[in-house]
Each structure stands twice: as structure tokens, then as C-alpha cells.
UniProtKB/Swiss-Prot annotation:
GO terms (BP aspect): L-histidine biosynthetic process
The protein, known as: ATP phosphoribosyltransferase
Principal location: cytoplasm
Keyword Transmembrane appears in the UniProt entry: no
Enzyme class: transferase
Any GO molecular function: ATP binding
PANTHER family assigned to the protein according to its UniProt record, in alphabetical order: ATP PHOSPHORIBOSYLTRANSFERASE, ATP PHOSPHORIBOSYLTRANSFERASE ATP-PRTASE
Sequence similarity: Belongs to the ATP phosphoribosyltransferase family. Short subfamily.
Pathway: Amino-acid biosynthesis; L-histidine biosynthesis; L-histidine from 5-phospho-alpha-D-ribose 1-diphosphate: step 1/9
Comment block on domains: Lacks the C-terminal regulatory region which is replaced by HisZ.
Function noted in UniProt: Catalyzes the condensation of ATP and 5-phosphoribose 1-diphosphate to form N'-(5'-phosphoribosyl)-ATP (PR-ATP). Has a crucial role in the pathway because the rate of histidine biosynthesis seems to be controlled primarily by regulation of HisG enzymatic activity.
Pfam families in the record: HisG
Amino acid sequence: MNGEIITVAVPKGRLLEESSALFERALGVSPKRLLDGTRKLAADAPEAGLRFISIRAADVASYVEHGAAAVGIVGLDILREEPRDLYEPLDLGIGRCQVIVARHKQAKPLPRGVAPRVATKYLSLAAHHFARKGIPAEIIPLHGSIEVAPSLGLADAIVDITETGETLRANGLVIEELVLDVSARLVVNRVALKLHAERLRRLIEALRRVCAETATPKVR
């Protein structure tokens, strides 16, 4: 492919597996296979005119917003927790999970007028959720082992992300409310969108077709 190579930021972990399957079907290149073959965090696919970089999921939006990557794959939880100036053309339908409110299954209702203590890494999402309900919650920032906070008396509830709920149940927690349904989104740097309009349009449409095929049940 002619022209400047376009950098795509893909998150490490499970989303790398799922996004690689989409790119392979859409463009014939697998970020995971390319990156597995090197110790570097970047690998080129010259035939597609792309360079893939593998970074922490929480950092993808920053790389794209500031132009270090033209395109990225980001969970909706990250985008809504810290809004960015990004073009968000496509729900990829992968990495599905939920941001929820959970409490200990043996927790007693709080006295009327008492603000609940809520442990979470989603400070903005949690604050907005309880504010919408008119509840003046005390938000306690944590970055790991959030599920144990209620049993240790640190918090009355947590706001966390879950896929199956198994870790919550293992720690005696029950889901009480949904905060946000989450899936991975394709995001694009706005300057890159102007500089590489046609190439990025083709990339987006190729992924859109694959996502539509995946979402549509096949008739037998």
C-alpha cells in the first residue's frame, strides 16, 4: 500500500486476541501474530500499510488523542471515565462486560441520610451514577483488589467492571445496579482523519463489515 504507514494502538490482554481476529478477517493481518514474533512492542504489516503497537488498555486513548497512534481500540468504560477528543466511529462488539454497583450479600441497609462509601477505580463514572440518583456518595479511590473492600469495612459498596460475576460472588458480593454496558470501540485521531481520510475510511468500513457479519446470525 502506498503512502505513510498508519499506526494502530491495540490493548494488551484479552482484547488483543479479539481485535486480532477482527483485523485478520477485515484486512488479512493479525496484530497478535505480528507482535508475538518480536520482543518489541511494535510490528509492521507493510502489505496493509499499518504498524501495530501493543500498550496498556488504559493508555490507548492517550496515544491516539495526542497523535502517537492514528487509530486505537478502547473500552467504553475508559472513554466514559475520562472523555477524550476522539472520533469514535464504531462499536466493535468485543470485550463485552459491565460496570456495576455491588454490595456484600450480608450488608444491611444504611441509615437514612448516611452517605454510602463507594470503593472504585472509576471515580467519575461512580460519582455521576450516584449524583443522578441524588445520593451524596463518598468515593474512595482504589486501583486493585476492590472486591475485598466491603468485607474489610473500607466501603459499603463498590463500582467495578465484571464479565461473568465470578470474582464478585467469590468475595460474597451481589450486583445491585448497572452503571454501564461496555464493549470495545474503534477510536481515531481527528487530525489523522483529515490527513488520511480515504485510507482510514476504508479501514473503518472493512472493520464495520466484519462486525456486521459477526453480529448477524447465519441462516442455515
